[in-house]
Amino acid sequence: KEEKMSNLNEIAPDFNLKNTEKNDIALSSFKGKTVVLAFYPGAFTGVCDTEMCSLRDSMNSFNDLNATVLGISVDSPWANAEFAKKYEINFNLLSDYNRDVSKAYDMIFNGLGGLEGYECSNRGVIIIDGQGLIQYRWVAENPGVEPNYSEIIEKVKSLS
């Protein structure tokens, strides 16, 4: 199996993705902060809704720890904007519509909801420290599995 780009203690691959306002958001612009990348398969799908709302409800903790949360999916900026509005998501949702970032972080899932050939982001969490190094990586065995939110906050605390 080939080495993937996103191993622990390696430099996180930089990226530039559009947020819900179609503004460019670069990972490198958060240098010095802890960054939580929350990959999710799709807006308006049950577990994704739960995951993003759980992260939303934890934002005060993340803010207190000088951490930024970035949600990443292959959805369009417009779908992400509606998703953010419906659930009052208070962090950037980024559109990886060409799937480059999901591939760079080895977060591609094939066949969501039985759609053969449909590639989306798998559910996963990457935590990057202020130096831009990957310090935590969790990937769902299948998109129906949620991350351990308290473990994520504990890891962010340990880096702050």
Residue spans for each PLM region:
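Chalcogenol-based redox active-site neighborhoods
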Residues: 4-160
